[in-house]
């Protein structure tokens, strides 16, 4: 049992606070206050650290890490796109250069095919009016000249003046020759002005135009009248395919009594009665004056 003293002492002890207890409580409050700012500063430091090198493993640190990752990923994607664009541009330039080369080769191939197709020089100029390739033009001209030379060589080559000795021979000369051959017949009689000049010109032109058949016949052989002999000689008749395509009487009225092969050539070309010459093989007929001077002393029957 408790005594009255114990109760009194106990109550005193229960409700009694000593000064030492107050001091202890003050110390505890100070310690508590001193520790509180330290604990509150920790999250701030952690947050700042999270914004720097992401050492914080909290929610904010994870978010910052994710944002940084997405930023790096975007930059890498943009760099890849730029690299791809550079590669595409490089490839396109390479492809364009190759296409240009193929296009140029195709143009040259087409040009060669057109040349092989034997088209005329006018058609060639029209099809290639935007191209100024002198090398191919020269090649085309050379090929055309070669073709003309071969065409002339396909037919007979005469290169001389044939003397017709009878009326029947005169008719056979006209009717039995190939239809593509041009025949020039000089009707003459000795002593008539211009006869020797015409005979000399015929010899020179026969050498210049081997595909043309040059002939001569006396008017008396073919039974011409004396009036024709006096008024029409020297006469030049041109036949092709059995048809008379040119008839020139008293040629001296146009050329004079003394003329040269170049004069007769120009006269016939004016009427389109001479074919194209072999430019690559034959010399110009304008040098025929020498030929005429050499043959002027020859006696032609």
From Swiss-Prot:
Coiled coil: none
Signal peptide (residue range): none
Gene name of the record: PDCL
Protein keywords: Acetylation, Cell projection, Chaperone, Cilium biogenesis/degradation, Phosphoprotein, Sensory transduction, Vision
Coarse class of the protein's main subcellular location: other
UniProt cross-references to Gene3D superfamilies, sorted A to Z: Glutaredoxin (3.40.30.10), Phosducin, domain 2 (1.10.168.10)
Composition bias, Low complexity: 36-49
A GO biological process held by the record: signal transduction
Cellular component annotations (GO), alphabetically ordered: cilium; cytoplasm; cytosol
Entries under CDD domains matching the protein: Phd_like_Phd
Family: Belongs to the phosducin family.
Name of the molecule in the record: Phosducin-like protein
């Amino acid at each position: 049992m408790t005594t009255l003293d114990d109760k009194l002492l106990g109550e005193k002890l229960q409700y009694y606070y000593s000064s030492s207890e107050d001091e202890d409580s003050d110390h505890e409050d100070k310690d508590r206050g001193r520790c509180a700012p330290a604990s509150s500063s920790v999250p701030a430091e952690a947050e700042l650290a999270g914004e720097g090198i992401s050492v914080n493993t909290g929610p904010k640190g994870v978010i910052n890490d994710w944002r940084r990752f997405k930023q790096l990923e975007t930059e890498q994607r943009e760099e890849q796109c730029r690299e791809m664009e550079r590669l595409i541009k490089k490839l396109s330039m390479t492809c364009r250069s190759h296409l240009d080369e193929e296009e140029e080769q195709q143009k040259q191939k087409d040009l060669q095919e057109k040349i092989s197709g034997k088209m005329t020089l006018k058609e060639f100029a029209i099809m290639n009016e935007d191209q100024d390739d002198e090398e191919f033009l020269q090649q085309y001209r050379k090929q055309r000249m070669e073709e003309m030379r071969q065409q002339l060589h396909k037919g007979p080559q005469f290169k001389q003046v044939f003397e017709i000795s009878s009326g029947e021979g005169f008719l056979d000369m006209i009717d039995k020759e190939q239809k593509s051959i041009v025949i020039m017949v000089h009707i003459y009689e000795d002593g008539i002005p211009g006869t020797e000049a015409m005979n000399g010109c015929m010899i020179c032109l026969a050498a210049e135009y081997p595909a043309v058949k040059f002939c001569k016949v006396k008017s008396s052989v073919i039974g011409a009248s004396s009036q024709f002999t006096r008024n029409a000689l020297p006469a030049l008749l041109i036949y092709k395919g059995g048809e008379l395509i040119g008839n020139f009487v008293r040629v001296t009225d146009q050329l004079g009594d003394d003329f040269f092969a170049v004069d007769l050539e120009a006269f016939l070309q004016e009427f389109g009665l001479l074919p194209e010459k072999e430019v690559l093989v034959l010399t110009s007929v304008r040098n025929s004056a020498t030929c005429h001077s050499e043959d002027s002393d020859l006696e032609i029957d």
